[in-house]
From Swiss-Prot:
InterPro entries: GCL_type2/YbdK_subfam (IPR050141), GCS2 (IPR006336), Gln_synth/guanido_kin_cat_dom (IPR014746), YbdK (IPR011793)
Matches recorded under Gene3D superfamilies: 3.30.590.20
Assigned protein family: Belongs to the glutamate--cysteine ligase type 2 family. YbdK subfamily.
Highest rank taxon of the organism: Bacteria
SUPFAM superfamilies per record: Glutamine synthetase/guanido kinase
Pfam families recorded: GCS2
UniProt EC number: 6.3.2.2
Broad EC category: ligase
Phylogenetic classification of the source organism: Bacteria, Pseudomonadati, Pseudomonadota, Betaproteobacteria, Burkholderiales
Cited function: ATP-dependent carboxylate-amine ligase which exhibits weak glutamate--cysteine ligase activity.
Coiled coil: none
UniProt keyword annotations, A-Z: ATP-binding, Ligase, Nucleotide-binding
Annotated protein name in UniProt: Putative glutamate--cysteine ligase 2
């Protein structure tokens, strides 16, 4: 199949998707009750969306198209409140976090939908191991060429979003040593990582045609890239964030991306190049492993800096854009988190207080509902 045309959309509009954990209130392990929750929320109010994910212990919610931080945050709060009320009726809880702390992949059940069955048959046990939970942020672009320019310009900021959102230190009952262990599950897929360095939608169409001709991919959904174009929506989609423990953090991350995109579009501080990816994998690993304490290398200057410091400098450069976009509350929340620590640190702090892991997950569910 040919690559579809890129649908023009209003620049810098936002859409947020959150993958969420469904928890048993008995032991706070994952609960395979997605179908029940989908039925319970079928008549929800609001323009947002709820749909199943690859296994039956998770769901995905998606915002409507938003332009500013305040309305986005309020919509996410409304989504949270309606979901929490529906979950209570089913004796389940909902939580953020990039991984469940002690679930075992072999116990997960593939959601009965054609695409999920296809993924399970193709990837085997990796499909069940993909019971991990991420935040995806869409940013509107006027055409495919500008979408690809922005996609590559954003590559150096990918570690920012990994470290700020990181909330997955525990896997199958063990502290992995990573702030974001979730992304290790994504790395296992053969079409993950970075998009190819092409600059025009026509050239990207040629790449897509070659890939479909091999039979390796059937649609854009088969690419698990960190940032990918979404032509039917007219967006690029950032996919590296763990689902935060709160909707306020999710809204702040989305608006941080919006501010960066505005600065890149208006100021064009550099021109993206293939060499931007020389240190991409190293920087990505540092953010996953060490979070805000990681070190990154600037692809232009080759200088190393602490990731926390680089984010702080970026936030300072974005002040004017955040003011114009009415996102100062969002950027302040992220500034505070640079000193308070990310959600991975919060989860480890709960564990350090001698809480058993089920109690840590219960605390995360309470935090989600606040």
């Amino acid at each position: 199949m040919a690559l579809q045309d890129f649908t023009p959309s209003e620049p810098l509009t936002l859409g947020v998707e959150l993958e969420l954990q469904l928890l048993s209130t008995h032991d706070f392990d994952l609960a395979p009750q997605a179908e029940d929750l989908l039925r319970e929320t079928a008549k929800h109010s609001g323009a947002w969306d709820i749909k199943p994910e690859i296994t039956r212990s998770m769901i995905e919610i998606g915002s409507s198209i938003q332009r500013r931080h305040g309305p986005l945050r309020e919509e996410l709060r409304d989504m949270r409140n309606q979901l929490t009320r529906a979950a209570r009726k089913l004796n389940i809880a909902i939580a953020g976090g990039g991984t469940h702390a002690y679930q075992h992949w072999s116990e997960q059940q593939i959601f009965p939908a054609e695409r999920f069955r296809y993924i399970s048959e193709l990837y085997g046990y990796l499909a069940k191991q993909f019971t991990v939970f991420g935040q995806h942020v869409h940013v509107g672009c006027p055409d495919g060429d500008q979408a690809l320019w922005l996609l590559h310009a954003l590559s150096r900021y990918v570690p920012h979003f990994i470290a700020l959102s990181a909330s997955s230190p525990y896997v199958q009952g063990q502290d992995t040593g990573f702030d974001s262990a979730r992304l290790n599950s994504v790395f296992a897929f053969p079409l993950s990582g970075r998009a190819p360095f092409v600059r025009s939608w026509e050239e990207f169409g040629g790449f897509f045609d070659k890939m479909t001709a091999t039979g390796v991919v059937q649609s854009m959904k088969d690419f698990y890239w960190d940032i990918r174009p979404k032509p039917e929506f007219g967006t690029i989609e950032l996919r590296v964030c763990d689902t935060p423990l709160s909707v306020d953090k999710a809204a702040a991350l989305a608006c941080y991306l919006q501010c960066i995109c505005r600065q890149l579009r208006e100021e064009k501080p550099f021109e993206p190049s293939e060499d931007d990816y020389l240190v991409y994998t190293f920087n990505r690993f540092q953010a996953c492993r060490f979070g805000l304490d990681g070190e990154i290398v600037d692809p232009k200057t080759k200088q190393r800096s602490r990731l926390r410091d680089d984010i702080l400098r970026t936030l300072t450069r974005l002040d004017e854009h955040a003011l114009d976009l009415e996102a100062l509350d969002a950027t302040q929340l992220l500034r505070d988190s640079l000193f308070e620590g990310n959600d991975a640190r919060w989860l480890r702090t709960q564990r350090a207080a001698m809480l058993p892991l089920p109690a840590v997950v219960e605390a995360a569910a309470r935090r989600w509902g606040e």
